[in-house]
């Protein structure tokens, strides 16, 4: 089931910035305990191995905005690839089209990037696409359709957006290129992907 509540509340519960900018913990939003009646008790307790795996799985799942069913399907795909499993997991997640649209600075969140793709505002290699979960490759080109670039809100955001180092973006042309797979050091440090791998290795055959 996909989580539809407040991303700020979810981030505080997980103790991790799902927006990757710590806005959820900025002054006026941070609280002394995680949401819920027993927040302090759960925060102070030592997590079991199972609970640690669950927490890391949830952090990764909610950050990339995918359901558990989608994650299992993606994990099966990653299991078939050669190389380091944890590295490949992050590479595949980062290579989703909605994530690349976000990394190129075309959308403030992955959720809004998914909406852009769903509504047909994104062109991949000269083809209009509407599937956010498409896995793209280094060298692929992404462009926004003209109708959405006319929005003052979109234009203003893109002009001031931060672009990830593993993509190139031409803000004036509203287009970009996925240059290379990201290094682990360029990705969120607050997730222990080894726990995520252990979680899904039990469930996915």
From Swiss-Prot:
**Pfam families noted in UniProt:** Ribosomal_S4, S4
**Coiled coil ranges:** none
- All residue ranges annotated as the S4 RNA-binding domain in the record: 95-158
On whether Ribonucleoprotein is a keyword of this UniProt record, the answer is yes
CDD domains xrefs: S4 (cd00165)
Name the PROSITE patterns for this protein: RIBOSOMAL_S4 (PS00632), S4 (PS50889)
Query: Which GO MF terms does the UniProt record name?
Result: rRNA binding; structural constituent of ribosome
Question: What is one process in the GO biological process aspect for this record?
Answer: ribosomal small subunit biogenesis
Enumerate the InterPro entries for this protein.
Answer: Ribosomal_uS4, Ribosomal_uS4_bac-type, Ribosomal_uS4_CS, Ribosomal_uS4_N, S4_RNA-bd, S4_RNA-bd_sf
Q: Which GO terms describe its cellular component?
A: small ribosomal subunit
Which keywords label this protein?
A: Ribonucleoprotein, Ribosomal protein, RNA-binding, rRNA-binding
Subunit structure of this chain's protein: Part of the 30S ribosomal subunit. Contacts protein S5. The interaction surface between S4 and S5 is involved in control of translational fidelity.
Note the PANTHER family from the entry: 30S 40S RIBOSOMAL PROTEIN (PTHR11831), SMALL RIBOSOMAL SUBUNIT PROTEIN US4M (PTHR11831:SF4)
Q: What does this protein do?
A: One of the primary rRNA binding proteins, it binds directly to 16S rRNA where it nucleates assembly of the body of the 30S subunit.
Q: Which NCBIfam families match?
A: PRK05327.1, rpsD_bact
The text of the family note is: Belongs to the universal ribosomal protein uS4 family.
The name under which this protein is listed is Small ribosomal subunit protein uS4
Gene transcribed to yield this protein: rpsD
């Amino acid at each position: 089931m996909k989580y539809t509540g407040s991303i700020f509340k979810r981030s505080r519960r997980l103790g991790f910035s799902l927006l990757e900018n710590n806005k959820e913990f900025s002054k006026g939003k941070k609280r002394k305990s995680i949401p819920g009646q027993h927040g302090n008790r759960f925060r102070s307790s030592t997590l079991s191995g199972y609970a640690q795996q669950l927490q890391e799985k949830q952090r990764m799942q909610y950050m990339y905005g995918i359901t558990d069913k989608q994650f299992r399907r993606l994990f099966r795909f990653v299991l078939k690839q050669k190389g380091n499993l944890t590295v490949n997991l992050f590479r595949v997640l980062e290579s989703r089209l909605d994530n690349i649209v976000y990394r190129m600075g075309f959308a403030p969140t992955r959720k809004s990037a998914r909406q852009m793709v769903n509504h047909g505002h994104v062109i991949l290699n000269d083809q209009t696409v509407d599937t956010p979960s498409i896995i793209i490759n280094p060298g692929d080109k992404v462009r926004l359709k003209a109708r959405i670039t006319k929005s003052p809100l979109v234009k203003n955001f893109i002009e001031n957006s931060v672009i990830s180092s593993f993509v190139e973006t031409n803000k004036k042309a509203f287009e970009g290129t996925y240059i290379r797979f990201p290094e682990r050091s360029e990705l969120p440090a607050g997730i222990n992907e080894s726990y995520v791998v252990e979680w899904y290795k039990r469930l996915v055959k």
